[in-house]
Structures are given as structure tokens and as C-alpha cells.
Amino acid sequence: MPSLEKITTTPALTFDALTAGAPGAPLVLLLHGFAESMHCWRAQVAALADAGYRAVAPGQRGYSPGARPNPNNTAEYHIDRLMDDAMAMVAACGYPDARFHLVGHDWGGSIAWALADRFPERLASLTVLSRPHPNAFNRALQLPDGEQARRSRHHTAFLEPDAADVVLADDARWLRERLAAAGVPPEAIELHLSVLGNREAMEAALAWYRARGAIRGPLGIIEVPTLYIWGDADDTVGRVAAEGTTDFVAAPYRFEALPGVGHFAADQAPDRVNELLLQHLAAHPA
């Protein structure tokens, strides 16, 4: 069973994390997105530990109360800081120089792509759920049909000054309905709300969007073995962006489209995600 641990990277930053598996075993770092939390990986953390890995799924900057700089200072939430956090947590877990496996969903996927671009020598494998390679995403955004732009319009809504109030109003009705409509089980929704269902956490989570940084910035060609998982019912990422990701990976690459699965695949289809993830990691050992 996963346990809740604290990971301190600097005197000012202590992250909550779901962990399982023996320290020193091959490391798998799992990065969540919005509007979920580290709890989206609970099934993967358990399965990875059972398979002999050390799995660490942190509550990232702003989501962990001990790692929540002032969200009004958006520089503290730039993607470079989020990348720094990930690498610092790897070191704090006892893997300062070792290669490790990286998994990301949504915003965590954006960080994962950027880390694979910057530190390919540190990664044994890359697995991304939902979020396509940024270059494929940008290309789809620019198409005249406007499909991907429509799917991404929530990014603009999250920049509004009252966005946190809107999302949390009426017992977080928007958030509950958003997750439920995407097939997230009720018990998982409550876990995510235990992290995000307060104004301090929500303002910090939305600061990621306000900082923007490299979420849409171009990256290089990825040279890390990559598994990309996309649900064909994902309302935030269209097929053009998803299928176009292959153009930006120059390493062993596997694209898996999950029929009927939405944006939150780890919560909606945990067994299938576990199966694909374990196959990928076994094929590319650290």
C-alpha cells in the first residue's frame, strides 16, 4: 500500500508524496496535473512497487502546503521552477545521479516533456498521459479548423482573477462536475478535493497557468524511449495533436489510444494504464 511521506528539497520546500517500494530500487517519478492531485497515481504507485520499483508521486509546488510560495508571484510557478522541483526531489529521494523513469499527466506531462528535452541522459524512459509533445500541440492549435483551440479555451478562463472562486463555488461544484463527467470515480474526486478544495491550494494551482512559461514553448526532438497514452474521449486534446506527437520523438515510441477514455486516464482506466506502463518500463530498464 502507498504511504504518505514528506520530501524536503530546500528549507522552504517540503512536498507531500505517495510512495511505495524499496528505497534504492529503480525509481519512477510520477507527476500529476490539474485538476487532480498526487492521488491520481495511487493505483500506479501500488502496481509499480509490486513490480519491484520505487514509486514516488509528489504533490507538486502549490499543491503541497509545505511547498506553496505566494501564488501572486507567478515567477515562483514558472515551468523552470517546476522542473527544478522534480529533479531536486529525485536527488532528495537518494537518486542524485541515477537514471530514473518519468511519468506525467496533463501539466505533469508538460513538465515531463521538458525534462526529457533538457535531461535525456537522466531518463531511462518517459511516459506521458494526455498531454502531447508541445510542438504537436502548437501545430494543432494553429490549424484553421480551430478544433484544438476550442478544446484549450479553459486555459484562458483560468487566467481570470476570480477563477478560484468560480471553481470552488457551491462546494466545488465545477470541479466535481468536471471530474465526474470525465469518468473519475467518486472516491477519487474526494481525494483530489482533499488537496485542491481550499482557496490557498486552488490559487497556487492556477498560478501554473498564469506563469505559463514553456507550456506552449517549442521543445527539441525527444531522444528518450517514450510511451504516450491518450484517451479518444479526451475533451482537452484532439486526435491531430495526439497522433502528431510521433513526429517529435526520435527514440523507441509507442502511442496507445484508449477507446472511450477521457482526460484522466489513470483514474478512469487504472488497470490498462498499469499494464502499458509496466510493459514500457520493463522494455527500457534504468
PLM features: what roles do these ranges have?
Residues 273:
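Histidine-centered active-site loop/cap adjacent to the catalytic His
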Residues 18-68:
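Conserved HGGG/HGGXW glycine-rich cap/lid loop of the alpha/beta-hydrolase fold
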Residues 2-6, 13-15, 39, 56, ...:
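Flexible "cap/lid" subdomain of the alpha/beta-hydrolase fold that forms the substrate-access gate
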Residues 11-14, 25:
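Short acidic/polar mixed-charge low-complexity motifs
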Residues 10-11, 32:
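Short strand-coil-strand connectors
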